[in-house]
């Protein structure tokens, strides 16, 4: 028989995230007007500080040198499953799309200068990133179909394409 249980260290972090979501995040989320963007943003900002400073739950996917928890794929799956039970959960842990993927991209391929300019503020929760995928000529959400491209023209970059 196959044992599908998590190793103790992963189960510990999974349960910690569950407790945090159940005792802190969900009550806050349910107490606000979820259609009022200013309340939603203020709640996320406030809970991010609690997650990071009081619970040690911050950037579960990133290395410690960037303030993260250095969790591997299995632990990230467990954390994501628990955080996703409250719609703002991934935002509170600074592990939401597209920032999580963009943090990985910057971590592995950015220059040191780019990391300081773009990755550090993302990891500190001071900025957000975006991904302009949709185009009028291409239906769907498959980024491999993106037609827009950039090319260097002297000292400048030219973006050629259409976005909605």
Where are these regions (language model features)?
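Amphipathic, small/basic residue-rich leader segments at the start of a protein or domain
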Residues: 1-96, 113-128
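Short, solvent-exposed polar/charged micro-motifs at secondary-structure junctions
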Residues: 41-44, 71, 103-104, 140-143
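Short hydrophobic "helix-edge" motifs at membrane interfaces and signal-peptide entry regions
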Residues: 53, 101-102, 151-152
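Glycine-rich, Trp-frequent "lid" loop and neighboring beta-strands that shape
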Residues: 69, 109, 113-164
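Active-site phosphate/pyrophosphate- and oxyanion-stabilizing loops and adjacent acidic/basic residues
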Residues: 77, 104, 148
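N-terminal glycine-rich flavin-associated loop
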Residues: 91-113, 142
């Amino acid at each position: 028989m196959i044992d599908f249980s998590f190793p103790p260290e992963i189960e510990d972090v999974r349960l910690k995230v569950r407790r945090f979501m159940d005792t802190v995040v969900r009550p806050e989320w349910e107490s606000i007007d979820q259609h009022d963007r200013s309340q939603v943003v203020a709640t996320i900002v406030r809970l991010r500080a609690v997650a990071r400073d009081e619970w040690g739950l911050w950037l579960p996917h990133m290395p410690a040198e960037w303030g993260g928890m250095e969790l591997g794929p299995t632990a990230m799956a467990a954390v994501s499953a628990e955080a996703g039970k409250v719609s703002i959960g991934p935002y509170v842990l600074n592990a939401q799309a597209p920032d999580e993927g963009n943090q990985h991209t910057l971590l592995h391929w950015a220059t040191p200068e780019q990391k300081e300019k773009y990755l550090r503020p993302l990891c500190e929760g001071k900025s957000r990133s975006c991904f302009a995928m949709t185009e009028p000529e291409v239906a769907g959400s498959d980024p491999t179909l993106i037609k827009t491209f950039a090319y260097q023209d002297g000292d400048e970059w030219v973006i050629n394409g259409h976005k909605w």
